[in-house]
C-alpha cells in the first residue's frame, strides 16, 4: 500500500464589498475562515452600478468615472484596514455593471486561471425594502452563480 499524497486545494473567496455593515461582516468572516482553513486568498470586489435608466452626457460620464475611482480607493483602504491583522493574501478589483454579473465574472476568471481552487462568492445579506421588492444581489447570485455562494447575515 503506497502513501497517499495529501493535496489541499486553495480556497479563493470572492467578497462583494461596498463598505456597508453587511459587506464588512462578509469580509471579516472570510478573513476568519481563511485564518483557520489555509491555504487561500480573498479577492475583494466593488462593483460600481448605474441603473440602465440613467442617461449621462460624455462630460457627466467622466465626472462619474472619476468619482468611482475615488470610491474604489476609499474602499480598497477600508478593506486593507479590515484585513491588516489577518495575514491573508488578498487583492482588490473594481468593476462596473450589474453587481451579481460582475461577481460571477470574477469567479469564472479565477476558475479559468486556477481550475483546482475552490471558489466561493461571499456577500452580506440585505434587509432593505428595495431588495425585497426587486430582488437582492444574493438572490441573483444564488440563481445564476456557477460556484457556491455564502450569504453572511
Residue ranges, per PLM feature:
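Short, well-ordered secondary-structure micro-motifs
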Residues: 26-27, 54-57, 102-105, 131-133
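Glycine-rich, Arg-bearing micro-motifs that act as flexible, cationic patches
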Residues: 118-144
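Structural beta-alpha unit
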Residues: 1-8, 81-119, 128
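Short, flexible loop segments at boundaries between secondary-structure elements
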Residues: 142-153
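A short acidic, glycine-rich active-site loop
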Residues: 61-74
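General small-molecule cofactor/ligand-binding pocket signal
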Residues: 43-45, 91-95, 150
Amino acid at each position: 500500500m503506497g502513501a497517499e499524497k495529501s493535496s489541499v486545494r486553495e480556497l479563493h473567496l470572492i467578497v462583494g464589498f461596498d463598505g456597508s455593515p453587511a459587506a464588512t461582516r462578509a469580509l471579516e468572516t472570510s478573513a476568519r475562515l481563511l485564518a483557520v482553513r489555509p491555504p487561500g486568498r480573498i479577492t475583494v470586489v466593488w462593483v460600481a452600478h448605474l441603473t440602465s435608466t440613467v442617461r449621462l452626457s460624455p462630460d457627466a460620464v467622466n465626472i462619474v468615472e472619476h468619482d468611482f475611482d475615488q470610491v474604489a480607493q476609499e474602499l480598497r483602504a477600508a478593506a486593507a484596514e479590515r484585513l491588516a491583522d489577518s495575514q491573508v493574501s488578498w487583492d482588490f478589483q473594481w468593476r462596473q455593471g450589474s453587481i451579481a454579473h460582475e461577481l460571477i465574472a470574477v469567479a469564472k476568471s479565477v476558475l479559468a486561471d486556477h481550475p483546482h481552487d475552490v471558489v466561493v462568492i461571499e456577500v452580506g445579506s440585505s434587509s432593505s425594502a428595495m431588495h425585497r421588492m426587486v430582488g437582492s444581489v444574493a438572490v441573483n447570485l444564488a440563481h445564476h452563480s456557477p460556484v457556491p455562494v455564502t450569504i453572511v447575515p
